[in-house]
Amino acid sequence: MTKYTEQEQIRRDKLEFYKKFDVVPFKKAYGLGKLSTSDELNKKYGQFAREELEAKKVKKNISGRLITARGPFLVLKDRKGTIQVYFNKKENPELTKIVETFDLGDILWVRGLLMKTHTGEMTVRAQDIQLLTKALKPLPDKFHGLTDTEERYRHRYLDLITNPESRNTFIMRTKIVQWIRDYFNKLDYLEAETPFLHDYLSGAAAKPFTTHHNSLNQDFVLRIATEIPLKKLVVGGFERVYEMGRIFRNEGYDTTHNPEFTTIEFYEAYSNVEGMMNRTETLIKELCKKIGKSKFVTNGVEVDLSKPFKRVNMIDEVSKKTGKNFRKITLEEAIEVAKAYKIKIEKFFTIGHIINALYEELVEPTLIQPTFLYGHPIEISPLSAKSDDPRFTERAELFINTKEYANMYTELSDPIDQLERFESQLEEKNKGNDEASDIDYDFVDALEYGMPPTGGCGIGIDRLVMLLTETDSIRDVLLFPTLKRIKK
C-alpha cells in the first residue's frame, strides 16, 4: 500500500470533498474563454491609473499555478510571469468553500475585472474561480526552489516551476536555436533530416552506442555525426544544407559532455575552411547582437566575442611549446618528445597522432579567447582535404576558454583519396583505435559521382548555449540530462 506524507494525504482527502460539490479536480480545457497572460495585461493596461482602470470595467480570463496565498490575495504563475487575484469571500460565500480547499501548486482559472491595488499592482478581482488541476503533492521548500543539484536534474519539471534562473536559461536556449536556424535559412540553406540509425561508424572519432534491428536482423549504431549523409546531399545538388539534431557518443560524462547532445552541421558548396571559419565567427557575433552583449563569463573567466577571433597553426604552436620543429621531425624523435611530456604512445601512433596528443596536452589549455586552431595532421582528419603540405589538412577547430566549440574542414571530394583514408582508419582500428572510422563504401560511391568543392562545419549547440547563458555545466542546459538510474 502506498504511503503518503501528511500533506499528500490532506490533499487526497480533498478529492472526496470535491465529489460532494460536483467539483472536477482534473478538468478538460473547455469553456475557459480567451485567456490573457500576465504580461499582456500589464503591457496593455499597466499605464492606466487605478480609477481609470476601474471605470473601464475590463473583464478578463486568466489561468496559472497558485504560488502564493495570503488573505484575500492569490498569486498565479503563467508562462509569462505572475498575476495577482483578489477574491472577496463575503461576495462569494458558496464559492469560498471551494477556494478555501486550494493548495499551493493547484492550477486555477479565474474570470474577473481588472483593478489595481493601493500599491499599483495589476490585479484581477475574481468573479469566478475554478480548479482546473489539483496538485496532489506540495511544491518543494515552500516554493523557494530545489537546492539539490541532482534533484533538479531528475525532477526538471519542479526545477522549472521553482527556479526562475533555470526557466530563463531554457527559454534562452530555445531562442538561440531559433536564431541559428534563422541565420542559415536567410543564407538560403536547406534544413535536412538524416537517419539516427547508421550501419557504419563514420563522420567523427568517437565510440558509438549499438543496437539491433529485429526485422532486418542487423546491427546498427546510433549516429555519432551527421556529416556523411549531409555530404551525400551536397552530391545530390543541395549546395547549402544543414541539420540540427541529436548526436550519440558512448564516451565521457562530465560538465561539458553528455552521451546525447545537440549539434548543427552545415555544408556549403564552393566554399572551404576559410569560408567556414568566417561563417562560424559571423554566426556567433550575430547571436551576441541578439542577446545584447559580447562579453561572457565561463568557469570564472571572461571571454570577449566582439574582437576578431585569433587564427593559429597547430604545428607552429606545438613546435613553440616543445622547442622542436615538428615539420622536420622523425617518428623516433617525436616519440622521445612525447615521452618527455608523459604521453602514452599507442600501437597505432604516427607523427600526426603524437602532434595531436601534444597539442591537447600543451596548447589546448592556453586557448582562452576565441581562437581558430588549423592545420591538423591527416591521420586524425580522414574526411578533410589535404593542405599544400600533404601531411596536414585544411581543418580548423574553434576554442574558447580551452573548450572546443566547432570543427570545420575543406571537405575531401576525391573518392580515391577518401577510400585510402578509410583503409588507413581500418588499419588503426585493427591496432586498437576503437574511435577509428569504418569503411563507408556507399559514401565513396557517392563521391565518385562528383561532389563540388565544399566547406563544412559542426558546432556543439549545448556548449554554445552554456557560453551564451554563462552556465558552467552541460546538464544545466539540457532539459533531461542522462543520469544514472536509482532504485526506487
Swiss-Prot record:
Molecular function terms from GO: ATP binding; lysine-tRNA ligase activity; magnesium ion binding; tRNA binding
Residue positions binding Mg(2+) 2: 404
Oligomeric form and interacting partners: Homodimer.
Keywords, sorted A to Z: Aminoacyl-tRNA synthetase, ATP-binding, Cytoplasm, Ligase, Magnesium, Metal-binding, Nucleotide-binding, Protein biosynthesis
UniProt GO BP: lysyl-tRNA aminoacylation
Organism: Mycoplasmopsis fermentans (strain ATCC 19989 / NBRC 14854 / NCTC 10117 / PG18)
Annotated localization: Cytoplasm
NCBIfam families documented for this protein: lysS_bact, PRK00484.1
Record: residues binding Mg(2+) 1: 397, 404
Cellular component terms per the entry's GO annotation: cytosol
Cofactor(s) the record lists: Mg(2+)
Protein family membership: Belongs to the class-II aminoacyl-tRNA synthetase family.
Note on cofactor: Binds 3 Mg(2+) ions per subunit.
Name recorded for this polypeptide: Lysine--tRNA ligase
EC numbers for this chain: 6.1.1.6
UniProt main location, coarse: cytoplasm
Reactions it catalyzes: tRNA(Lys) + L-lysine + ATP = L-lysyl-tRNA(Lys) + AMP + diphosphate
